[in-house]
Amino acid sequence: MLAIDESELNQHAMKWIEGIKKFTEAEDVVVCDGTPEEFKQISNELIKSGEFIKLNENRYPNSFLYRSDRTDVARSEERTFIAAPDASMAGSLNNHMTLQQVSEVWNKFFRGAYRGKTMFVIPYALGPLNSRFTDYGIEITDSRYVVLNLHYITRMGKQVIGSMPEKFVKGVHATGTLDPGNKFIIHIPWDKPEGVDADILSVNTNYGGNALLSKKCHALRIASVRARKEGWLAEHMLLLEVEDPHGRKVYITGAFPSASGKTNLAMINPPKQYAEAGWKTRLLSDDIAWMKMKDGMLYATNPENGFFAVVPGTNYRTNKNAMITLSRNTIFTNTGMTKTGEPWWEGLDPLQEELYDWKGVLRKPDGEPIAHPNSRFTSPLSNYPFLSDRSEDPEGVPVSAILFGGRRASLVPLVYEAFNWNHGVFMGATMGVEKTAASEGKVGELRRDPMAMRPFCGYNISDYFRHWIEMGRKLSRRPKIFYVNWFRRRQDGSFIWPGFSENFRVIEWILYRLDHNDNAIETPIGYIPENINTDGLNLTKQDMEELFRIDRDGWREEMKSIGDYFSQIGNIPEDLLIEFEMEKRRIS
């Protein structure tokens, strides 16, 4: 940690920091240097205060458990706001806040918020350093937990201080009282209220996406506004490298709403028969991809430097690479813990003995979950066993295919290909997830999550669709767009497709389609595979027919639902409405 006067930050940053210090009445200020010594010092302070528990050093070296407040366990969409002079700029899917309301929150909750506390200044960069993607930010916080998470998920500290530009994204976070009714996560991408010199404000929360301002707040909500203005894309997408047996490498991005298989696909290993044939996969990003144009193509990078991922359900069968990643140098949030100091969550081998649940209660693993369903692990990208050697490429990697996917029990085939770019945008704009349990609301109820950006687009979603259409016009070599659905079920409720590493069989067909015009059947909704490799899978002819069955009656109902959804959003781009009308005609 550095004293403010020895940090070598530029004068613009120093002036801003001094202003925040004065307003929040911080007792002292330190600039985070990002060193292992700093991490050790802060983690020891958290252990001493009881906020961190040191985990079993033999099984999980340099790893810790953090338990959040019981009311502060997930991103809070209903408490997340876009501040704009006019509500239409935020759009119907965002919560709008007036500039006057921002001023009120700033003065009520941030004035004196650090009284008696240390103010931590975290200089960070998103994207590979010294690249055309690099974007800088500073998060100011009173939370040591936030500091240590940013150690892992960003490039931060000394390595970015010297290159911090005069203009950077300014984020201010205050833990506050954790009062859920006064929790605010505010984004100010356009005009600022007088006296509020910040792009992001977060208060009365200390959880993940609400408090780690580099992540969803900067890398998606603020970045998406800038991307539209500057002509690029900031997307809630994985980024995967696939190498075929001939050594050819192809790069794929994919947008999936929560619980739709994004992390597992990002971390996929080819099944045994493919690996033996020479296929390889390598990760670039599990969560966010920034894409910029070059030579008529999209080139992508991961703006982040680590993982902050959901952990329940993860085991050596479902995601071996995640298990390797979280086995060291990891912060666990809201998992359970065994008496021997090992983290535990649902999906690991069942235990009969008592263990500590996510609230710290020692009990048998029956009844309520031991780990919170949204419990997380934070690990550096360098922990991952199969990282692409182009993860730091200053130019990014060329994107050949874009995947959209949702969780649908019926109707949507295992995979289908868009007829063209605009049709692909229509597919992404209308993707959705079915509720799968009574506790989540009505079973089968559909939540539309366009491009998986519903909670993360920093501006009006109809303008976002328009931006995608315009990007397609500018590209001479557009990625092909596909839709995947791993979750189609049989009549008895069981999943038809085995999923997990077997999803690679779908990737194989997608890669084939990038260079070939055959092995596809035209349907009213897009191209489906004529043949897909199912050798070794326990799938019947009836299963395969059901995986790709086009239910015209069901699709007519889907079109009605999409019409209602478009009416709710309003101002849908003409090109998208044309695709909608063409789809309806093909289905009728």
UniProtKB/Swiss-Prot annotation:
UniProt-listed Enzyme Commission number(s): 4.1.1.32
A GO MF label: phosphoenolpyruvate carboxykinase (GTP) activity
InterPro entries linked: PEP_carboxykinase_C, PEP_carboxykinase_GTP, PEP_carboxykinase_GTP_C, PEP_carboxykinase_GTP_N, PEP_carboxykinase_N
Cofactor section: Mn(2+)
Catalytic residues identified in the record: S260
Residues binding substrate: R75, Y207, G208, G209, S258, N374, S375, R376
Residues holding Mn(2+): K216, H236, D287
Catalytic reactions of this protein: oxaloacetate + GTP = phosphoenolpyruvate + GDP + CO2
Gene Ontology cellular component terms for the protein in this record: cytosol
Textual note on the cofactor: Binds 1 Mn(2+) ion per subunit.
Function: Catalyzes the conversion of oxaloacetate (OAA) to phosphoenolpyruvate (PEP), the rate-limiting step in the metabolic pathway that produces glucose from lactate and other precursors derived from the citric acid cycle.
Family membership noted in the UniProt record: Belongs to the phosphoenolpyruvate carboxykinase [GTP] family.
Record-given protein name: Phosphoenolpyruvate carboxykinase [GTP]
